[in-house]
Amino acid sequence: MAEVHRPRGVPRHASLLVSLCFGILFVAKTLGQIQGSAGQTDTKPFTASVALREGYDSNPLTQSYQSTQDIQSSTYTSIQPSLGYNYLGMQADMALRYDFSGTYYPSINQQYDIQYAQTFTGRYTYAIDPRTSFTLGNNFVYTEQPLVAQFVQAGISPTFNTSTINNLATVQADYRVTDRLSMITRWNNTLVYLGGSSANNNYMNNGAFQQFRLDFTPETVGTFSFDYQIYDYDLDNTYRDNQQVAFSVGADHTFLPTLFFSGRAGLQLNDNFGLADNDFIVGNGGLGSGEQEIGAFPFASITGTWNYEQRSFLSAGFSTQIQQSNQANASDSEAYTLNLNWDHYFTDKFSVIQSFFINVATFTPQLSQEQASAARLSYQGSGTQTTVSYQCKFAYEFLPYLSAELGWSYTSYGSYFDVNNSNNPSYNRNQVYLGVRGTY
């Protein structure tokens, strides 16, 4: 993908952002006068919002604290407009949304001092009858100098690429076989294209998902799921092509109308067939065999949600998974993830939103140091990678369409191994901001 250069001169960007802001508000006001043709009641046919923020970032380039260079900090200005359309009909409903996020770091003063992301989301659902419905969905994300939040949740250190394209398309069918038995069938396709030095990580993912849901009681639903995914890399110079099959059982239980729990446990099988092309792999047949035994690894997760007030809720989730490496010379990993979310309204106008995420992954090498040396491979030994993210935002609504925001976010990523410790990506980052948000 061709490299995109920003225009020279900050005033040009400033005028563009201001024009975009006023343009969105004007369009929202105009479209808001159009009545929905399907008899919408509570849902507005058109929605619009825009947030303007001024803040400080302690480490916008996610520089490692192990680096010999001074970590560069910067103030920043960001704009986040959003447009949405909702249609509700007798048999069909549709939702479209466009989100933009742009941030300017004046202290960086380089080509990448402006970072932005655009997201297009669409969903269309058609109900053939009360028992059967089909849903088409698509989520398209384009970023220029990718935002850190998109990488942290995946447990990896962000890399500054020229551009990133990520598209997820889904087709889903929901069908109730009997009064107690229902099914969900879904196909997914993911395309990932990365620019710059990460272009060799481009890949396509196709998958199929089937779930059976049995209503044991009005409060308890049992599930059995089958999930198949295949990954195909454009430039597979590291032999990463693989396929995964997962089986799981679980249950969803409603203790109270406001208290809900869900749990899953299963087994995942990995077939790293891309290794068959690697002449240096130490497999079951010895050096150069290009073989790796299909691994079966367990996983489990549990989540809970408590809606204790009309607009306030508390949710938590925990999961654990053992993942086989897609290279025989690398390490298997065992990961633990914890998520916490809390939205609370102190009054009708004053609220707080908090989220906490932590992922701890431990790695165990498949080869000894002697085997790795014989295969001319690097060896790092055992290691641990830890990702922590916390976000907090206070909001006060002055008017029904205007509110003030005060927020803080913290991100930490650490990577440590016994041998040849490559912890250069390890970093800490703090962001604080003050802003306003207009909504329609």
Show which residues each predicted segment covers.
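N-terminal secretory signal peptides that target proteins for export/translocation
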Residues: 1-12
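Alpha-helical and His/Cys-centered functional microenvironments
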Residues: 9-11, 17, 52, 358
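Bacterial N-terminal signal peptides
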Residues: 15-25, 29
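Gram-negative and organellar
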Residues: 31-440
